[in-house]
Amino acid sequence: MTSEQEEVSILTLQVTFPDPELPPLSLTVSPEESVQEIRNYIRDAFVQERCITSFTLNLNGQPIDGFESLAEIEGLESGATIELTNAPYNEHEARLHVIRVRELAGFSNNSHAAVGQDAGMTAFNRTEGIDKTPKDYMQEVVETKAQKEAKAKLKAEQKKAKAAAKAEALAKNEEVSEDEESEPEDDTPMKQSTQVLEENSPMHGFKLEESKSLQELFPDRQNLPAPALLSLHLSHWNPPTQAQQLNGELLYLQCATLEGESYQIVAHTNGFYVANSTLGSFDPSPKPLMVKTKAKKQNGGKKGGKKTETEISYVPITTENMHHSLYDLLVSLSDKFAKKIASNYAELNAAGMLSVVPPTNCFLANPWLTKPAGFRRPDMARNQELLSLKNLEGQDDTREWSEDLQSLKELPRETINDRVVRERHLNKTYFDFTEAAVAGAVQVVHGEIQPINPSEPEASHIFLHKGIFYSVGADGSGTYAEIGGDEAARVASAKDLQAVQQLVQFDFPEIASLCTTVVDYQGKRIVCQSPVPGIFRQPENAPPQVKYGSVEGAEEIASEQEFGDAFKPIAAAFRLKTHTVKDANKEHSLHLASDCKGLAGTDGRKYLLDLYRLAPVDIAFLDANPSYPHQLALLRFEAVEAYFRHQVRAEIKKQSLDEDETPKFEVEPFYLNPDAFVLPAPKEDEDAVRAASEFVSNTIIPEHVEAVIAGFGTTPIDGQQLTQSLHGKGIPMRHLASVIAAAKKSDTSKAQFLAELCEQEIAVRSAKHLLRNEMAKKGANPKYVVAHVMNLLLGSTSKVFDTPAGLLAVSDSVNLSVDEAKAAVAAIAKTRFGYDLDTSIFAKRPVQLLRELSGKLGLQFLQKEYEFGAEPFAVADVVNILPVFKTTTFRSKLVEEALEAARNSVNTDKDVALQLLRESIPLAEQVYGSVNPELTKVYNTASYLAYEMDEALLAADLGRRACIMSERCSGIDSVDAILNYLNLSLFEHAIGNYVGALHMIKHAVSVWVTVCGTHLHPDIITSLSNAITMLTTLKRWNESRQWLEKTIVITESVANEKAQAPLRFQLAQTMCHEQQYKEATDELRRALKLFNAHYGEDDQNTKDCAVWLKSLTQAAVSIQRQKLWEQEQGRLARQAPKPTATHQKEAPKKASKKTKGKGKGKDDKGEKLVAELKKKKAGKR
């Protein structure tokens, strides 16, 4: 890139404000950024000072508002001045402004049905030995190549000057003190860590075998600071009449300040002012504005001089002098307002803003244990829907979700700015739909929304609310009667959602899919979808909307050519074969399953729905398990893709053997027929589907288990990670029994652990079905059902809770005994998984089962120590039952491409990779917002790349962000959070913060043991080895040895002898530092034996160990000879004449001078010997 291109790629702009107290804002931006992004930045940059929300931007007197990029604005050059002018409010802008001021004042609203108690909590602020506030990595952390070279040059010059000064001092026979020789004191992380570790070690006294108590698992609630106002909400004088609206009045507000004063405020098109209204009388006319001025008055003092005093005067309010910002008005009314906001921000900044900033595009994680409810501040605005963001964004009954979504999908994507705008709005729209759908589904379950077909059975009820179509996840119409009824209908909704999610990621421009969310709440499943445009407003004689697929089951099939051509790319992406289907009249050639429907919307777009059969039948599983509850067992998309690639590789290999030229063949013959074993199909299609189904059982499962056992795959920690790992390989969870069988073929500890975790997951999923069925029964009170069934499974009592008068009766589950409940779970396990479940697992792993069940059913329990085995749960212990949902989400391809480009440049051009990395982070934050689970992945990937590029400070900063984000979005005890803490320990170690690194490992491992239920997890050895390395670096030889010995014991239990060799080698080196040479020699012999057996004689580790053993043996002989010589010298000395008094006094002086400043004693000898051994090893190499 030339210098001219670099100059054009950056614009420097000045933004001026109408308020002279605000200095101009300097912006350094890219020409690709949009005007809207500049507007958003200004809103965020001045939220604490002024809360500017309604304004226009002008260049040379002309407005430049819009979504166009800066490069498209005529006359805009680097150095230009943009003038910001206040713009009149409308009702929408006024309400948005009030919400921003409320947020700034400290009011929050977490009343959504999916937001549980203590949602989004983090333990990061409670960890020790680490910086809690992430740095500005864009400016402070990342250094340019020139800066690094300049710093290295300066350091080299300083070192050279210091050496010259030392040489000069020695030449003059001047004594150089230890302080002069040592490095100057500093406050670097390494220096701090060393000082702290001399007093205490985080690993000291840590009992690995003991898991965290339930009381310690989640930290105490982090209460937000008190708001800067007593209240700020809509007044009861709302809404303004038509006549008042003509006067410019938009809203009426009521405010109470910390001083105890109450004000009635009018939101006007020109700003905000205090009205003459009171609680009992309405008068929107403005009160005179109280102004404090300074005037000189005659003072009657001794000297008779004049003194300046403050005088209060009242100025009439006009459209010219009213406050444009509500913030400014409140500052003038309350002296404590601005001070309290500044105090709150300082408190939040000290705790880390990332841990408290509210999300805009995601839901936060709900902990399964929560403290008793704390103090709740009164806030009238909580029940005022006018201040709801849902209404602000038009989420009312008339919103056309499908139209909004498809319009966004059709936005241009030619430039980076186009893609950022498109992806940000798509991500936000999908979340807005999910938010509205989950809230509506809860209302449906509570009976608060009337069905549009009330005369039909309850299972057939459908609802239309806020532009969203709701249906019950049951077979109310009999569509699935032949393949499993309600069970099949429930599964079909989940399969449909999976297919829609795949389509969202494929992002086909010509195909319109529906926003879809599936909500499970209190045992009931509600399917939420955006309606196809025009589906409820069809004229009487209009042609049928279904243009492709089944119209009325298999009796009538549609196959219009235009739709078929549009759907063909989708079939290729899903590896589906074009096949022939017969209806009552003729044959049809279909690319997708016959159950899929292509509809023509009234907006002219092609809509694709009913996608639950976009994968072939898992026929091998159904044949082997005839009692399975439904016939809708399909292959996962990952398995279809794996089988396709397997077939293509086999064909390539076959052709390569037959011909020398590059193989050329069509891949479509390797596609699968989705209607095979559903409708009549050719035998070759059925054989291909059966082969793919058997490929899962005979190839994918054994290979995955072997990979885990061999260490090439991760050994899962909990059920969620197990599910993700199996799904990633294309293994459905109904195959858990096959995974257990494959694992039990090996006698290794990894295989045993995998089998036990799979058995735990079978128990959890079977118990989930029992609890779900009991809660869904008519007349059941969910809270009582949960407490009762949990006591049956995790306790030993069938006691029935007394239901208070007025509440509905508990369901029939009260008739179950403990044995009957566990037998019911075992029966479900046999039916659904084909596995004979040992129900004693409920007594062996109660905490783990409670945690997993809570996550799958949305349960929150009171955080306390439960006495499992008796009657652990009371009704009051069930704090909350939350909706559990799966939904369509949009992942940014632009962000993924930026990170991939950075990854590919790491080894070729580090500066380019670093620049790409720096750009990808703000890009991701633009698309996803400040808080989002996708940001966790971005921070995690970016931190690793920075670590590989030796940008340790940047890696540590991003690692801290990943920890906070994963805790808030996935949970404090999630596997993501555990792994991110372990990764962060490496980054903290790289910057020299060993104390912080050890604290990270200690925290992660303690949560790991609690979640896993045992410290004998195969992968925990790596984390302990990292801790040992850190202790060794700090010369904590005794602790290093203790943890090495513990780790070797764990390795003997969960790993093979090969894993012990390097640990024993490291233990021997640690023993040398403690001068325990005999024990070190013994350990070296054991290590060398293991190295020879498992690594081979030619391996470098084997050679190094042999060198150490040989050198240590020789050193031991020398040490023994030295001891014998010293003993002989002592004997001769005792026989010689005694020295004079002078000699007796001089000898200690010489010895003292010799050892002056060393202060190492015994340890110094061990370190010298280790240094000699390392030198010999290097020489051998």
From Swiss-Prot:
The keyword Manganese does not apply. Keywords: Cytoplasm. Residues 1150-1159 have a biased composition (Basic residues). GO terms for cellular component: cytoplasm. GO terms for biological process: intracellular distribution of mitochondria; mitochondrion organization. The keyword Transport does not apply. One of its GO terms (molecular function) is mRNA binding. InterPro entries: CLU-central (IPR033646), CLU_dom (IPR025697), CLU_N (IPR028275), CLU_prot (IPR027523), GSKIP_dom_sf (IPR023231), TPR-like_helical_dom_sf (IPR011990). Pfam families: CLU (PF13236), CLU_N (PF15044), eIF3_p135 (PF12807). It is found in: Cytoplasm. Residues 1160-1173 have a biased composition (Basic and acidic residues). It comes from the Eukaryota. Residues 165-195, 1130-1181 are annotated as: Disordered. Its main location: cytoplasm. Residues 176-187 have a biased composition (Acidic residues). Residues 379-622 form the Clu domain. HAMAP family: CLU. May associate with the eukaryotic translation initiation factor 3 (eIF-3) complex. mRNA-binding protein involved in proper cytoplasmic distribution of mitochondria. Belongs to the CLU family. This is Clustered mitochondria protein homolog. It comes from Yarrowia lipolytica (strain CLIB 122 / E 150) (Yeast).
